[in-house]
Amino acid sequence: MADYKTIRGTSTFEYEEKRSRFIATAAFADTEEKALAVLNAVRAANRTARHNVYAYVLQNGHTRYSDDGEPAKTAGTPVLETIGHAGVADVIVVVTRYFGGILLGTGGLVRAYTAAASGALQQAELVSMRLVVDCSVRVSYAQFEQAQRIIAAAETRLDEPVFDDAVTLCWRMPAGQEGALCTALNELTRGGAEVEISEPQYAAF
């Protein structure tokens, strides 16, 4: 499964077109349930708004959008396309419109929804997501420093060691790269090291 980019947390951006206010909220959402929770929260915070247009793209390929009463293809579709052009996934963008009394026409609506969604995504912090595994191993105090060097020399994110009757080392690394590291640790400990490896998961790395 391929690495991908998403955003961290939530970002907002406001765009105005002929007195209509377009307030875009972009948020991380890696499931449909989380995406809809963001949508419902934005709706609840903007009960007097005319429209709450949204689109989301999940890493698994699932997408969804809504014009929420705007003319077809003038609102939800531009928001969805903006997410696609940004090259991100596991993202929902909700654009709340407060009507300003002047009709914008189809071209004006497309421009406004695109600008609002694009602004929110540009404000967001991008994060690279990789398929990773979390690993841990217990080694003796005599083996600790060399084991730590072996782990640190690989592409890993190494946590602080935990000291008790032995030393526990925990780290995160890209899935599929753990085999060589396990071999090196087994050689160091003469087969005494039992590396625990989690199921692969997507995480910032």
Model-derived features: where do they sit?
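Conserved short beta-strand edge segments in small beta-sheet-based binding/regulatory domains
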Residues: 158-162, 189-205
